[in-house]
Regions:
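Short, hydrophobic/proline-enriched secondary-structure or compact coil segments at domain edges
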Residues: 48-52, 57-69, 113-121, 171-176, ...
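Extended intrinsically disordered, low-complexity coil regions enriched in Ser, Thr, Gly, Ala
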Residues: 68-93, 127-141, 183-204, 253-276
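An N-terminal, globular interaction/scaffold subdomain
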Residues: 1-108
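Internal, hydrophobic cores of structured domains that mediate oligomerization or house catalytic pockets
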Residues: 82-188
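Surface-exposed polar/charged interaction patches
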Residues: 15-19, 44, 94, 98, ...
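Broad, structure-driven detector of short, well-ordered beta-strand segments within folded domains
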Residues: 39, 46-57, 100-112, 158-166, ...
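Residue-level signal for secondary-structure boundary elements
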Residues: 21, 142-145, 206-210
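C-terminal structured domains
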Residues: 192-295
Length: 295
């Protein structure tokens, strides 16, 4: 069996993702610049986790997130969007092998190549890493903001990672965490649970309809969910509350069948009724869990 390089495997997966008309339907005009990124992000014998982020309704676009979990000691990153972050890569190289499952990386707007990338860091429970990370970036206030927000979160809502735009004075910090399974079940069963959480932490941008929607979505999130908030420099929460649903691996073709007539069909109907997705979901499902390549 021929073994591929990391870059070669990523390029093949990218080709598959864009095949059968999916490029224009899912990614719009942003797709061509993505393949140019891979030679710059496949680092030595370590390849990052790569996420293609695109909407399932509205104008198509494509964002690219790359996350590094470890450092081989041969860290090369010829990426203009990451200019000015060399210090953080050296810092991460020095500590990454001493901590489990931490990562850092970048989020690129592929429609605006050259604009500074957002920086992502996942310290998980290692809160002692937050301020050193932000200090190297010259964003000490963001580190203090993350820690003060983490201290507000109730059980079941622990923060795990965050993202920021460097050098944007007054911009919010995106904070994220994994919802504990017991908490997910409790919130899905009783909207008063999520209301009390929002009130405790000071998140105000919700109404009754939103509470019911959150409970309904979480009742379908049997494979797990994470949550996201925006936090302003003064410590107040913005108007964003997001939920990411996880989907466990299935064999090729099973995911599409699941959403069309299986256990995920109720979730699909729910999202269609709320006008969160349209027919392009079928195009996305056509590439989900469809290929793997040995490297």
């Amino acid at each position: 069996m021929v073994m591929l390089s990391w870059e070669g495997a990523m390029q093949l997966l990218l080709l598959h993702s864009s095949a059968d008309g999916r490029e224009k339907v899912l990614f719009g005009e942003d797709f061509p610049g993505v393949s140019d990124v891979f030679p710059s992000i496949c680092v030595g014998d370590v390849c990052p986790d790569v996420y293609l982020e695109f909407p399932l309704i509205g104008k198509p676009f494509l964002d690219l997130t790359v996350l590094y979990r470890e450092n081989s000691g041969k860290f090369r990153l010829d990426l203009p969007e990451a200019a000015g972050t060399e210090g953080i890569r050296d810092w991460f190289a020095g500590i990454s092998k001493d901590y489990q499952k931490i990562n850092f990386g970048y989020e690129l707007d592929t429609g605006r190549r050259g604009s500074p990338a957002a920086v992502h860091f996942q310290p998980r429970g290692y809160l002692e890493l937050v301020e050193p990370f932000c200090k190297v970036l010259g964003e000490e206030e963001k580190g203090r903001l993350y820690l003060s927000t983490a201290a507000k979160m109730p059980p079941g809502w622990k923060l795990s990672f965050f993202g920021m735009f460097r050098g944007r004075s007054g911009s919010p910090l995106r904070v994220c965490g994994y919802l504990a399974e017991g908490e997910r079940v409790a919130v899905a069963a009783d909207i008063e649970r999520i209301r009390s959480v929002f009130q405790k932490i000071g998140f105000r941008a919700f109404d009754e309809k939103m509470l019911h929607q959150i409970a309904h979505v979480l009742s379908e999130a049997v494979d797990g969910a994470d949550f996201q908030f925006d936090v302003w420099p003064n410590g107040s929460f913005g108007e964003t509350f997001a939920i990411d649903l996880k989907l466990r691996n299935r064999r090729p073709g099973e995911m599409k069948e699941s959403f069309n007539s299986g256990d995920r069909a109720p979730l699909r109907q729910l999202l269609e009724d709320w006008k969160i997705i349209d027919g392009r979901l079928d195009a996305a499902l056509g590439m989900t869990f469809a290929r793997n390549y040995p490297v």
